[in-house]
């Protein structure tokens, strides 16, 4: 058996695995210090009671011969697909265009596998590292970096005379924490249509958007139905990080260059490769969508963002994002950070683990990402430490 040559293009360790190893090493060498880990975007708040009860009831039905069921529908429970159409998309996406899955990351892999190798894939720089790794694993012909710089409000800049097949676009963005407004997103959709680009729109953090002027879905731009696929997840909105449930939207109007509908092939693809997501998880998500606006977890994380942003600004750092996403994009100055390695600076001096911006791409150099998804008590300790000079730690 020959090794898949696509693995040769990957780094030895995935970014967050490497950070875990470095934190563990610091723990072993400095057991007297408590490290506050604000590096990885993992959730900490429990399920809402209504969601947990729906989950328990669904599981209980599997224990009785009279209510047991086997496989569910390949594309998801009709009740959940309909609820998503009504509650999140307000009718601009039909239930038949929504496909329930076991998470956004695996859907990204499925989609890039579905469209096949030798695609030219464009990604924002900085961006979630899984986009590039998955593109490489699925045999992308080329990966085009779209610089998202501070002086351009972190908007992607498209290179001239460069062909792109697929654009991975995330808003609210990981890692910058910034969100596209409707005019900005409309311009990208227009560019994609003019240049025959398919947009894979990652809306995993849309639940954090609170401003009516900011789109939660790319399909708030009507023309996006001709050029975009959207992926989303219940990991942050309902606390399903360890439960695994997401969805993909493929509009009926989206076609190949020969006019054939993509949704038809996607159904065939899923029927072969996927037997449907967990039924208890889907029933729990259906219950959660009924009370989505009342769920406390997102509000909790947004308050964490506010606390961190306030402390970081007082400590002299430049801070971006955090208002409509659970991430803060932080730029230390030479005066505040004498270290070359920003991860080591925060770990050694403040005993806080963050994600170095360079891990998200070359344009992330000089920045770090703070996650607000931690526990409040940890965030408060981090805020207190940030108010102290490093020498006093």
Curated annotation (Swiss-Prot):
SUPFAM superfamilies: PLP-dependent transferases (SSF53383). Its EC number is 2.6.1.83. The modification N6-(pyridoxal phosphate)lysine is found at residue 236. It holds the Pfam family Aminotran_1_2. Signal peptide: none annotated. Pathway: Amino-acid biosynthesis; L-lysine biosynthesis via DAP pathway; LL-2,6-diaminopimelate from (S)-tetrahydrodipicolinate (aminotransferase route): step 1/1. It catalyses: (2S,6S)-2,6-diaminopimelate + 2-oxoglutarate = (S)-2,3,4,5-tetrahydrodipicolinate + L-glutamate + H2O + H(+). The keyword Transferase applies. Pyridoxal 5'-phosphate binds at residues 71, 104-105, 128, 174, 205, 233-235, 244, 275. Its cofactor is pyridoxal 5'-phosphate. GO terms for molecular function: L,L-diaminopimelate aminotransferase activity; pyridoxal phosphate binding. It is an enzyme of class 2 (transferase). Keywords: Aminotransferase, Pyridoxal phosphate, Transferase. InterPro entries: Aminotransferase_I/II_large, DapL/ALD1, NHTrfase_class1_PyrdxlP-BS, PyrdxlP-dep_Trfase, PyrdxlP-dep_Trfase_major, PyrdxlP-dep_Trfase_small. One of its GO terms (biological process) is lysine biosynthetic process via diaminopimelate, diaminopimelate-aminotransferase pathway. Substrate binds at residues 14, 41, 105, 128, 174, 275, 369. Homodimer. Belongs to the class-I pyridoxal-phosphate-dependent aminotransferase family. LL-diaminopimelate aminotransferase subfamily. Involved in the synthesis of meso-diaminopimelate (m-DAP or DL-DAP), required for both lysine and peptidoglycan biosynthesis. Catalyzes the direct conversion of tetrahydrodipicolinate to LL-diaminopimelate. This is LL-diaminopimelate aminotransferase. It comes from Chlamydia muridarum (strain MoPn / Nigg). The gene is dapL.
């Amino acid at each position: 058996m020959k090794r898949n040559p696509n693995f040769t293009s990957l780094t030895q360790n995935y970014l967050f695995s490497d950070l875990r190893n470095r934190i563990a090493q610091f723990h072993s060498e400095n057991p007297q210090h408590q490290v506050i880990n604000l590096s990885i975007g993992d959730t900490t708040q429990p399920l809402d009671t209504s969601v947990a009860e729906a989950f328990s009831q669904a599981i209980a039905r599997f224990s009785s011969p009279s209510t047991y069921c086997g496989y569910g529908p390949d594309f998801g429970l009709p009740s959940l697909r309909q609820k998503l159409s009504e509650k999140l998309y307000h009718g601009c996406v039909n239930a038949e265009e929504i496909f329930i899955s076991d998470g956004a990351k695996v859907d990204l892999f499925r989609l890039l596998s579905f469209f096949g190798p030798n695609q030219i894939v464009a990604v924002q720089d900085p961006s979630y590292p899984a986009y590039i790794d998955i593109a490489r694993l699925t045999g992308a012909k080329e990966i085009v970096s779209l610089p998202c710089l501070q002086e351009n409000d972190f908007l992607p800049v498209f290179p001239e005379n460069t062909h792109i097949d697929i654009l991975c676009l995330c808003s609210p963005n990981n890692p910058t924490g910034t969100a596209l407004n409707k005019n900005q997103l409309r311009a990208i959709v227009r560019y994609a249509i003019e240049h025959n680009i398919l947009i894979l729109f990652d809306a995993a953090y849309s639940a954090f958007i609170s401003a009516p002027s900011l789109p939660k879905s790319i399909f708030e731009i009507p023309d996006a139905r001709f050029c975009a696929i959207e992926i989303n997840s219940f990991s942050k909105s309902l606390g399903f990080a360890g439960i695994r449930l997401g969805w993909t939207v493929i509009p009926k109007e989206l076609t190949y260059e020969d006019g054939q509908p993509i949704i038809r092939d996607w159904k065939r693809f899923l029927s072969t490769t996927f037997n449907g997501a967990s039924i208890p998880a889907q029933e729990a998500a259906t219950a959660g969508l009924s009370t989505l606006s009342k769920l406390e977890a997102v509000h909790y994380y947004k308050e964490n963002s506010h606390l961190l942003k306030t402390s970081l600004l007082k400590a002299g750092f430049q801070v971006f994002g955090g208002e409509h996403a659970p991430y803060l994009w932080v730029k230390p100055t030479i005066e505040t950070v004498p270290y070359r390695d920003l991860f080591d600076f925060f770990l050694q001096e403040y005993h806080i683990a963050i994600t170095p911006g360079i891990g998200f791409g070359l344009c992330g150099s000089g920045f770090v990402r703070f996650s607000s998804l931690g526990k409040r008590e940890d965030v408060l300790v981090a805020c207190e430490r940030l108010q102290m000079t490093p020498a006093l730690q």
